[in-house]
UniProtKB/Swiss-Prot annotation:
The gene is Garin2. Expressed in testis (at protein level). Keywords: Cell projection, Cilium, Flagellum. Belongs to the GARIN family. This is Golgi-associated RAB2 interactor protein 2. It comes from the Eukaryota. Interacts with CALM1. Pfam families: GARIL_Rab2_bd. Seems to play a role in sperm motility. It is found in: Cell projection, Cilium, Flagellum.
Length: 440
């Protein structure tokens, strides 16, 4: 009976120790209930003591002692049900000077004065995960990329329950973090769209705001009116809803009366969405200029635009007719313009003729000259031969014997054969030179 009673008492003590309220509301709760942080932070949902270690599980020592920290999860406002903050607390220097070992001081319940709240980090910038379930080690990764490893430091009979609570709490915190990031992204996008809408409609519809921001210049500058090319306003096509020109008389009464002195002739070709002109029929012959954010837009009469278009079309037609005439004249001319019987000296002292004759080289010209001289020499030889024969024929038959006639024929044949052999051997040399050689 005595043994049974003792066992019952031990079980009751253990059950009393395992009550969640006992270790959930600990030292951090006492600090927060002190009055300094009460209006801003709710009581922590979960609180535990950890020792800072490295990735391999080796403890990190600060001031020759293990660096331990108390971690608590809470919400920044008591109204919020979900936690969104992480609290970090450390021992004061006085508490670290105690002669007892550090592990024993952690197991003992300490007063509220031994802890100091040092960090107050939003869970949006923290990522919690289980690094080692066997060693009861957590990983804390901050938004700047740094990672810290915390190993649970609790009594043996509490370690499993406390660590299981952290394991159950971590996925809930990560889900809330994902939801908050999605909501923040949507809100940021909506703020951006609203800001762009406001910036697009702010002060642009009101022309008086531009007049207040930008001072007016009383002097008007005159420019020459011989500007034929049209100004390109394609860069300013995004200026939508700039002006609603409903009453031109109001614009003229407000002080834009010096428009007639401006003699700029330009064409507004691509500014289609800038203005909505409803009552411009009364001011048909007057040009209206508006100065909006440094851009001058000149409205012209329709007659001027039509005349300009007609002038452009006329010039284009005139140019096309001239081109066609020149082409037809060039095609109708049977013979191209040539320079007949004119020799032009070039760098190499060569000559060419432009009477639709092939260009002759130096060798061809030299051969022609040699042929001409040889023909002249042959004609001279024939004339001399004829004269000799005539003189011989005048002689009487009695004076000329048969032997002399045969001798003259023989000499003539030899001369002709010698001449042919020399011509064949000398090639393109002139025949006059051959004749002189024969005479010698």
């Amino acid at each position: 009976m005595m043994k049974k009673n003792r066992n019952k008492k031990a079980m009751n003590k253990q059950e009393a120790l395992f009550i969640p309220h006992y270790y959930r509301l600990g030292h951090l709760k006492n600090i927060l209930d002190g009055g300094e942080y009460a209006p801003y932070v709710s009581p922590p949902i979960l609180e535990s003591n950890f020792i800072q270690v490295n990735r391999r599980g080796e403890s990190i020592y600060l001031h020759n002692r293990a660096n331990w920290v108390t971690v608590g999860i809470c919400s920044s406002n008591p109204i919020f049900k979900t936690p969104n903050m992480m609290l970090l607390a450390h021992l004061t220097p006085e508490a670290r000077k105690e002669p007892e070992p550090l592990f024993k001081t952690l197991l003992k319940s300490s007063s509220s004065g031994t802890l100091v709240l040092t960090r107050f980090i939003p869970l949006q910038f923290v990522t919690l995960s289980v690094h080692s379930a066997k060693n009861m080690r957590l990983k804390v990764k901050l938004i700047n990329g740094r990672s810290y490893y915390l190993q649970l430091c609790a009594p043996v009979y509490k370690q499993d329950i406390i660590f299981s609570q952290w394991v159950d709490l971590i996925p809930l915190l990560n889900q809330e973090k994902i939801k908050n990031t999605k909501v923040s992204e949507v809100s940021s996008l909506s703020e951006l769209t609203n800001s762009t809408d406001i910036a697009g409609s702010m002060d642009i519809t009101d022309i008086t705001a531009f007049r207040e921001l930008r001072p007016r210049h009383p002097k008007t500058h005159r420019y020459p009116c011989n500007i034929m090319e049209s100004a390109d306003f394609s860069e300013y096509t995004d200026v939508t809803d700039v002006t609603d020109v409903t009453d031109v008389t109001d614009m003229l009464d407000n002080g834009i009366t010096d428009v007639q002195d401006i003699k700029i002739v330009t064409e507004v070709t691509e500014v289609t969405e800038v203005t909505e002109v409803t009552e411009v029929s009364e001011v048909s012959d007057v040009k209206m200029a508006t100065n909006i954010s440094g851009v001058k837009i000149v409205f012209e009469n329709d007659d001027i635009i039509k005349t300009k278009q007609e002038e452009k079309e006329y010039t284009l037609k005139h140019r096309s007719l001239q081109d066609t005439k020149t082409k037809s004249d060039y095609q109708d001319s049977p013979n191209p313009v040539t320079m007949s019987n004119i020799a032009l000296a070039l760098q190499d002292e060569g000559c060419f003729q432009t009477t639709q004759t092939p260009v002759k080289s130096k060798e061809d010209i030299y051969k022609e000259i040699c042929d001409e001289t040889s023909e002249e020499n042959m004609i001279r030889l024939q004339n001399i031969h004829l004269k000799a024969t005539e003189s011989r024929s005048t002689r009487t038959d009695s004076d000329i014997s048969d032997g002399e006639l045969k001798l003259g024929r023989y000499l003539h044949k030899q001369c002709s054969s010698r001449e042919q052999s020399f011509i064949h051997s000398l090639g393109s040399l002139p025949r006059g030179f051959v004749f002189l050689h024969l005479l010698l």
